Amino acid sequence: MDIYAVAVGRVGVELDAAQLERVRATHLRVQGWGMEKYPMYGVNTGFGELINVIIPPQFKSDLQHNLLRSHAAGGGEPFPDEVVRAIMTVRINCLMKGYSGISPEALQLLATMLNRGIHPVIPMQGSLGASGDLAPLSHMALPLIGDGHVRKNGVTRPTMEVFQEEGLTPLKLGFKEGLALVNGTSAMTGAASLALYRARHLLRLSLLASADIVQAMNASTRPFSHTGNAVKNHPGQVVIARLMRDLTEGTGLMRDHQDIMRAISERTSHSNDVEETEIYLQNAYSLRCMPQVLGVVLETLQMCQRFIEEEANSVNDNPVILDTPAETYHGANFHGQYVAMACDYLSIAVAEMGVLAERQLNRLLDPHINKPLPGFLAHAKTGLFCGFEGGQYLATSIASENLDLAAPSSIKSIPSNGQNQDIVSMGLIAARKTLALCENVGTILSVLMAALNQASHFTEAAKYSAPIRSIHEKLGKVAPRYEDERPMSTVIAQVRGVLLQEQGLALAQSLVNLDLTPDLSLEPRA
């Protein structure tokens, strides 16, 4: 099962019947242990620092419902529906492993809500990332007991109003069920999975922009040769160099290294004196270092995918229910450090794509270094007309903002919960920052690709490689040659709408064959 397909594509989920029987067996085992008063965290104890308080069986439902209500303490704006759907999907997958004590009925109700588009209202703020994402998952779980609010068809309403319309009945939770729903990493992992998907698309766009600008600026083909890149030993660098060759194949705008050497020889007198030519044997870094810069971005995405996918398919509950009370694992599988650090790495990679794009934009616009293109790509009479001067301010501003967002969250632990939670991951903060960075870098790349589309009007457009011509054709339909006749923000928004919506995703995937597994996926069973 693909998280993105469920979260964004609104594909439904179906619970495996055989696995539900395993879930039921574990649930019944926990209910029996609770009645027999075996000491077990969250079954017959208080929560967190209150673990030393023993709770008699007659309060089993009160204990679980109180947990959900008291820990539904999130703040800030609610997550958009697609993030909520990702969170629900990942939590269902964790609980379907059969190690948590949840009832099949609770899982079926959660899946029904997901399939009918009934989305719990989950505020963005409030998670420390250990014990898991308590606040957001409590908000996710409230509707199961008829509490809280849900959003359906974009309208937020009390849960019971929607349940009554849909013929759904809230549950009375048994031993450990509330804890099973909230004590895990599913909020950060759901958000991180969407950030990873978006980062992969941004890498494709970054490659397309890079293949475009080296043609617009008549750059050298030599930096992308296989031989030179292969001796560096990094697989990602070799892949990016290959993709740059693929995306520029057939171009009539780039320069062969031998031709550059020949031109230099023709310009010099071969005397023993120092001579200055106007020919550069090598291009600036933003036209030359894509294999090195984007290669490590590619490998970082691959590493982060492994961390996030493993977490999405993990049992991240506590305690982990095994065959007997004595074997049951009281530990810390709820801790989100893997996801937190994956998101921090991912944030740096996404921010670096923004840095590269902003520098490429500057090289395309700066009248001192962008010859033979007009300054700021003004269509005529530069100075009277400003061209993309204003667009550069937006890109540079966002690139600077990104430097703050890329600072790590996973090392910013603050003790809480009576010193019980004395080292936490801040994983959801890291995931939220990564999502914000993806939005920001999407805007920077939109400015760059709008400018590259404008640059094609000042070059021999027919000489671009076929993949880049297809991009120009697509963008030209919504953003024709810019002549200062409309607000620059309109141009950027139109280009962004093409690049970052489904048609842009499909086009980029068809043009850029990244060496990544197709989708972040969930295993169907334990």
UniProtKB/Swiss-Prot annotation:
GO terms (BP aspect): toxin biosynthetic process
Reported modifications of this chain: Contains an active site 4-methylidene-imidazol-5-one (MIO), which is formed autocatalytically by cyclization and dehydration of residues Ala-Ser-Gly.
CDD domains referenced in this protein's UniProt entry, alphabetically: PAL-HAL
Position(s), cross-link 5-imidazolinone (Ala-Gly): 130-132
Disulfide bonds: none
Domain of life: Bacteria
Active site feature: 41 (proton donor/acceptor)
Enzyme Commission (EC) number: 5.4.3.6, 4.3.1.23
SUPFAM superfamilies the UniProt entry points to: L-aspartase-like
Signal peptide feature range: none
PTM annotation (2,3-didehydroalanine (Ser)): residues: 131
Reaction it catalyzes: L-tyrosine = 3-amino-3-(4-hydroxyphenyl)propanoate; L-tyrosine = (E)-4-coumarate + NH4(+)
InterPro entries cross-referenced by the UniProt entry: Aromatic_Lyase (IPR001106), Fumarase/histidase_N (IPR024083), L-Aspartase-like (IPR008948), Phe/His_NH3-lyase_AS (IPR022313)
Pfam families the UniProt entry points to: Lyase_aromatic
Binding, substrate: 71, 183, 288
Molecular functions (GO terms): ammonia-lyase activity; L-tyrosine 2,3-aminomutase activity; tyrosine ammonia-lyase activity
Similarity field: Belongs to the TAL/TAM family.
Function: Has aminomutase and, to a much lesser extent, ammonia-lyase activity. Primarily, catalyzes the rearrangement of L-tyrosine to S-beta-tyrosine, which is probably incorporated into secondary metabolite myxovalargin. The aminomutase activity exclusively produces S-beta-tyrosine.
Database matches in PANTHER family: HISTIDINE AMMONIA-LYASE
Quaternary structure and partners: Homotetramer; dimer of dimers.
UniProt-recorded name of the protein: Tyrosine 2,3-aminomutase
Native source organism of the sequence: Myxococcus sp. (strain Mx-B0)
